[in-house]
Amino acid sequence: LVLTAGIHHPFYEMETLYSSDLNGQAFAMREQGSGTRRLFEQYVADQGLSIRITWEANCPRTILNAVLYNKVLSVMSLRLMYHEIRHQRLRIFSPENQEWNRTFKLVYHKNKFLTPAIYELEKLLRQYPRIELPKETGRLKQ
């Protein structure tokens, strides 16, 4: 997960942010109960911050559009915004200590028939175990 700011947001031009910079900022977030939201809300609480959630959606594209066109911030998976990053419409910030990194596991029943599609998925997951951050990624410091 990374913090993201659209090209029209004041943070877009910054290379380094501090957690205190997030205080009072407007955010577009996933719905209540989302693991992404829970992880970020814990970070906000740990840092003693207060943010404003002005958008709430269960669709990543809706959240991304809010970031692009409404000067809000969000915390999202890097994998959801390659196109926008490549075309310099978004600036991303990664926490220094990588505390927002997540691990996913493929779980299946050992006695069930596995389809070729599942084997392909497993092969893809092993092929891309980690995602590289773009070189222009900003830093989020505490």
Residue spans for each PLM region:
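Residues embedded in well-ordered beta-strands
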Residues: V2-T4, P10, L73, R91, ...
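Short secondary-structure boundary segments
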Residues: I7, L78-L80, N97, F104
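A late-sequence structural motif
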Residues: R91-K135
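Flexible hinge/capping segments at coil-to-helix
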Residues: L1-F27, E31-Q32, P116
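Short secondary-structure boundary/capping segments
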Residues: L1, Y18-S20, A45-D46, Y82, ...
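Hydrophobic hinge/microswitch elements
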Residues: G33-F93
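Ligand-binding clefts/hinges and TM-proximal coupling segments of bilobed small-molecule sensing domains
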Residues: G33-L39, Y43, Q47-L49, Y119, ...
